[in-house]
Each structure stands twice: as C-alpha cells, then as structure tokens.
C-alpha cells in the first residue's frame, strides 16, 4: 500500500478525468430525440401475464 500513498494524486487525476468525460457524454445525450425514436419493448418470453388467468381470490358473499 506504499504505492498508494506515493501515487494518490495520479489516481485522483484519473478519477477526475473519468468524471469529466462522463459529464461531457451525458450533456451530448438528447433525451427528447431518444424518447421519440425509442424502440417498442418486446413482450416477455415467459408470458407471466398469461399463466394465471383464473381468479384465486375467494369470492365475497353478499
């Protein structure tokens, strides 16, 4: 861990560089254009919405 104490500033510069590049890329992202061209999501392959069609809850007696 001696190298970490000696070269902490290089790690800090790398982290700042990564952070700045991430901010630059996020600023380039056009959310409205993405939402306009967003692809339709395919249905799930396991069809969870169709495997249990019957009603399992007990019926209320009036």
Curated annotation (Swiss-Prot):
It is a single-pass membrane protein. It is found in: Cell membrane. The keyword Ion transport does not apply. It comes from the Bacteria. Its main location: membrane. Keywords: Cell membrane, Membrane, Transmembrane, Transmembrane helix. GO terms for cellular component: plasma membrane. The chain crosses the membrane at residues 3-23. Residues 36-62 are annotated as: Disordered. Pfam families: UPF0370 (PF13980). Belongs to the UPF0370 family. HAMAP family: UPF0370. This is UPF0370 protein plu2724. It comes from Photorhabdus laumondii subsp. laumondii (strain DSM 15139 / CIP 105565 / TT01) (Photorhabdus luminescens subsp. laumondii).
């Amino acid at each position: 861990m001696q190298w970490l104490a000696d070269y902490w500033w290089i790690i800090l510069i790398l982290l700042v560089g990564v952070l700045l590049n991430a901010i630059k890329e996020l600023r380039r992202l056009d959310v409205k254009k993405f939402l306009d061209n967003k692809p339709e999501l395919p249905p799930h392959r396991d069809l969870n919405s169709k495997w249990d069609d019957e009603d399992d809850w007990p019926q209320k007696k009036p």
